[in-house]
Amino acid sequence: MFGLKSKTLTGTGSVVSGPTRLVKLYLVGGSSAGSVVLKNGGASGTTLFEMATPAGATLTQNIDFNDEGLRFETDCHATLTNITSITFLHG
C-alpha cells in the first residue's frame, strides 16, 4: 500500500479528518489499565474498534489490521484512556 501517513497522539483527538484506512497502530501504555476506542464520525460517532490495555508504564502493543485495513468513511477519532502515546499508520 502506497501513500501511507502516520499520526501520533498523546491524548484523545482526531487521527485524521476525512476518509482513511487504518492499517497499523503502535501504543505505549500507561501505569494503570486503559483503553483505546476508535470511532468513525467524531467523538460521538460509530465505534469501529475498541481494546483494553493492561497496566504497565513500559507496555507496548503493535496491532496490524488485515490487508484491507480498518475503513473510516468520514474520519477517525481516538478516545484514549491511560495511554502514554499511540501512533497510527493510515492511508
Residue ranges of each PLM-predicted region?
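Surface-exposed, low-hydrophobicity beta-strand/loop segments enriched in small/polar/acidic residues
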Residues: 1-91
